[in-house]
Amino acid sequence: MPSADARPAGRPRNPELDKAILAAAERQLGEAGYAGMSLDSIAAAAGTTVPAVRRRFRSKAEIVVAVIDSLRIQSIPAATGPLRERALALLRNFHANLLRRNSLAVVGSLLTEERRYPELLDAFRRRLVEPRRAALRQILIEGIDAGELPRGVDPEVLASMLIGSFYARYIATSDLPENWPDATLQQVWPAAA
């Protein structure tokens, strides 16, 4: 029986090919949607073969989940420092992630496919949306408890307003200005003078 330390047979995976496959899948998901992408087209765009893609991903849905995971270019900031600054760091982090090429198009594709493939949007919510909202909600709760935000403010509604403003701004103007995180937070949690 082989030892637990034994390497699997065969050549090690090429991390550059892994990146190329994910980039091709992300581009196709953003441009053609889930229904418009295929393992064949992903393999061709990545400069590889379908068997090479299948060795990494069992299905198109599994590739999309990997794309969703790759959309988080920056981790959620650590929970240290003044509360308002933590909220601002989280919103700036969200902004940076949204500005990544294809991020908003991928979100649009997932929304479009929700009726046929609800598990894809669910994966997006679980892996990206819920952790960020939970972190922001916690900061808002701490801000209310510390008296920095008014009592009676609903942290769930406020989190939706702050995060939702990014999507609303983009839909209305096709633009997310660099100062958007600062401008939105200033409306509900003014900086000390």
What annotation goes with each model-predicted range?
Residues 123-128, 145-160, 172:
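All-alpha amphipathic helical-bundle segments outside canonical DNA-binding/catalytic cores
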Residues 24-32, 86, 90-93, 106-113, ...:
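Solvent-exposed, amphipathic alpha-helical segments
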Residues 75-107, 158-159:
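Hydrophobic alpha-helical connector segments
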